[in-house]
């Protein structure tokens, strides 16, 4: 990754988890025990307890990220993560039970402003980390205050001035542990989710920032309940997306996103890079949200060349 000057300490290789973890520990920002490995080394993991999480140190999307329960599984996952990593190293850390929270901030003149936080709902009982939904609301007011405190710790430690800031954390028993952070907005369709939840057009503000202007943020809570549902498919070649525009035109969905295009081949449904599409739903109550999602799922289809629906339906029933 490139060095980026953010008005103070130079942040090198923002996607480099080794560098990031080192600084989290140095500045006493809560995070899990970890080790950086370029090959299997049991002595480095003496005090670790299974299950463990293995990640490439420097890699896009969630490729190579695995949860392992045994030494044999660790060997396989480590070899894969090292291959995926640009640095040929992997990070191994203890798996933290709890809710995964994705929190977006905008740093304005060295002060972190809270935009929104969502719960990254994953598929149950799997070794991979397949995110099925980003759910809102995810936290209460007290937890929002704690998130702001952690974000400001990161801002102060790195002397950040004007930049988006994404922090991913685990929440358990009202305690946060930082998984990772980066000076960027969330990828894919996250920009739209931020806008719908907070009223902030983060994409436009980021462009203004790059052009030398100083965007001013005034986030507010726009909706009561929302969910971004991610769509995965069974293996096959996509021929057409059915039902999306009709649901948008009839206001069942707020927005939809096609991450794949017609003619592309789907081989698996594991990482964020495997998603075929996504759609955003808002509601006034949790029950209304669930009813909308159930109806939408029944109306959508992704057809292959033979007219067979290869969309994985009912995924919202499989979340943790």
List the predicted regions and their residue ranges.
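Active-site nucleotide/adenylate-binding loops and adjacent lid/helix of ATP-dependent enzymes
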Residues: 16-91, 97, 108-110, 133, ...
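Short, flexible turn/loop "capping" segments at secondary-structure junctions
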Residues: 56-59, 128, 269-274
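Short, well-ordered beta-strand elements within core beta-sheets of diverse protein domains
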Residues: 66, 94, 195, 276-284
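ATP-dependent carboxylate/phosphate-activation module, predominantly the ATP-grasp catalytic core
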Residues: 72, 94-160, 164, 171, ...
């Amino acid at each position: 990754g490139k060095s980026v000057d953010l008005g103070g300490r130079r942040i090198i290789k923002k996607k480099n988890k080794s560098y990031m973890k080192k600084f989290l520990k140095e500045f006493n920002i809560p995070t899990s025990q970890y080790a950086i490995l370029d090959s299997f080394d049991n002595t480095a993991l003496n005090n670790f307890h299974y299950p463990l999480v293995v990640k490439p140190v420097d890699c896009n999307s969630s490729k190579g990220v695995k949860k392992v329960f045994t030494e044999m599984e660790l060997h396989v996952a480590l070899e894969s993560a090292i291959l995926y990593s640009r640095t040929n190293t992997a990070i191994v850390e203890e798996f933290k039970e709890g809710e995964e929270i994705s929190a977006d901030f905008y740093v304005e003149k060295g002060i972190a402003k809270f935009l929104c936080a969502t719960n990254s709902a994953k598929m149950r009982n799997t070794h991979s980390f397949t995110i099925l939904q980003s759910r809102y609301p995810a936290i209460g007011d007290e937890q929002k205050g704690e998130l702001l405190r952690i974000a400001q710790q990161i801002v102060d430690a790195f002397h950040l001035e004007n930049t988006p800031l994404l922090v991913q954390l685990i929440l358990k028993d009202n305690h946060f542990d930082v998984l990772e952070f980066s000076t960027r907005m969330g990828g894919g369709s996250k920009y739209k989710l931020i806008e719908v939840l907070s009223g902030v057009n983060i994409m436009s503000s980021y462009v203004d920032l790059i052009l030398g202007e100083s965007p001013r943020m005034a986030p507010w809570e726009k909706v009561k309940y929302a969910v971004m549902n991610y769509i995965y498919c069974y293996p096959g070649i996509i021929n057409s997306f059915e039902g999306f525009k009709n649901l948008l035109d009839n206001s069942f969905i707020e927005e939809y996103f096609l991450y794949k295009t017609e003619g592309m081949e789907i081989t698996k449904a594991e990482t964020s890079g495997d998603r075929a599409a996504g759609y955003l739903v808002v509601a006034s109550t949790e029950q209304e949200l669930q009813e909308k999602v159930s109806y939408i799922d029944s109306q959508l289809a992704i057809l292959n060349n033979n007219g067979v629906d290869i969309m994985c339906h009912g995924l919202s029933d499989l979340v943790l």
